[in-house]
Amino acid sequence: MRYLITGATGGLGGHILEYFIAQIPFSDFAASSSSPENRSRFESRGVNFRHLDYENPTTLNRALHDVENLLFISTNANVIDVEKVKRQHRNVVEAARKANVKHVWYTSLPFGGLTNDSEVSVQRAHLATEKMLKESGLTFTCIREGIYVEGFPLFLNWYPETTLLTLPRDGEIAFTSRVELAVCTARLMIQGGFENRIVLLTAGETITAKELVSVINETTGRRVELRYVSPDEFVDAGPRNDRGGKSRAFFETLVSLWESAASGELRTMDGLMAEILGRDPIPPRDAVRQLLVENRDHTWHQMYAKK
């Protein structure tokens, strides 16, 4: 099997799968999911399916048999549980090594750009995985994917009903279209190369929280106000006032994300994405405006705590 796409029921993985369906013979790739119940969803479209669960080494060993290129989508485990992420990723790397996978394409995060200096907990988990890959002897490419522009409500903790937003800090973020990231990731895999390298895919412009609020107001006619509060006040008030029922740990994580943005960790941009697309990526301001024109109440699934 030339290509195995993990996370095929998710956002990024799903878009990558659609690119493969449109561009590659069906016999050359397979989709995988942690839920065997998804088999019919793919096979009804003629797509090969393999059950693969990051928590279950048996499924990993079986699914990775004869795979040449593995798209290793980082786990969707709660980003607050860094140790769980590391454990699951270690399972994948070990199984890929045992299966002699020829090339692992890993989706990482862009905190710190192309450096390894970020102290943000979610990025430390990715850095640990990148280190595992380097030490495994596998051929790999770590793709640091830009922050999804579609998820901007999560960074602001903005709901359609919100009239007053509070944040602990502000900073520039190179928010990037998830659809464009998927296209570029798929093209990287298909064209090959970039062996044992870390690459960065981002939009060519940045945007701040203050500017995001302006776009919300300009596009939807709302009058959302943004105030800056201390990190302690933000964390204390967040769980009490949150419509989505998110935990205190979420707001602690959000503080660290905005502190990293304020220090410049998310403003690094790279020209590789434009090179792969053959044009400039959609700027974050335009992307947010487009999302809100399509749905003035645009939201993001992680805004609501899982029950």
UniProtKB/Swiss-Prot annotation:
Gene Ontology molecular-function annotations: oxidoreductase activity
UniProt source species: Aspergillus flavus (strain ATCC 200026 / FGSC A1120 / IAM 13836 / NRRL 3357 / JCM 12722 / SRRC 167)
Encoding gene (name): flvB
Task of the protein: NmrA-like family domain-containing oxidoreductase; part of the gene cluster that mediates the biosynthesis of flavunoidine, an alkaloidal terpenoid with a tetracyclic cage-like core connected to dimethylcadaverine via a C-N bond and acylated with 5,5-dimethyl-L-pipecolate. The tetracyclic core is synthesized by the terpene cyclase flvE and the cytochrome P450 monooxygenase flvD.
Catalytic reaction equation(s): (2S)-5,5-dimethyl-2,3,4,5-tetrahydropyridine-2,6-dicarboxylate + NADPH + 2 H(+) = (6S)-3,3-dimethylpiperidine-2,6-dicarboxylate + NADP(+); (2S)-5,5-dimethyl-2,3,4,5-tetrahydropyridine-2,6-dicarboxylate + NADH + 2 H(+) = (6S)-3,3-dimethylpiperidine-2,6-dicarboxylate + NAD(+)
Family matches, as InterPro entries: NAD(P)-bd_dom_sf (IPR036291), NmrA-like (IPR008030), NmrA-type_oxidoreductase (IPR052718)
Xref: SUPFAM superfamilies: NAD(P)-binding Rossmann-fold domains (SSF51735)
Pathways involved: Secondary metabolite biosynthesis; terpenoid biosynthesis
Enzyme Commission number(s): 1.-.-.-
Stored PANTHER family: NMRA-LIKE DOMAIN-CONTAINING PROTEIN, QUINONE OXIDOREDUCTASE 2
Enzyme kind, highest EC tier: oxidoreductase
BP terms from Gene Ontology: terpenoid biosynthetic process
Name of the protein in question: NmrA-like family domain-containing oxidoreductase flvB
Binding site for NADP(+): 4-9, 32-36, 53-54, 74-76, 148-151
Family under the similarity heading: Belongs to the NmrA-type oxidoreductase family.
Gene3D superfamilies: NAD(P)-binding Rossmann-like Domain, UDP-galactose 4-epimerase, domain 1
Disulfide bonds: none
Keyword field: NADP, Oxidoreductase
Pfam family for this entry, one: NmrA
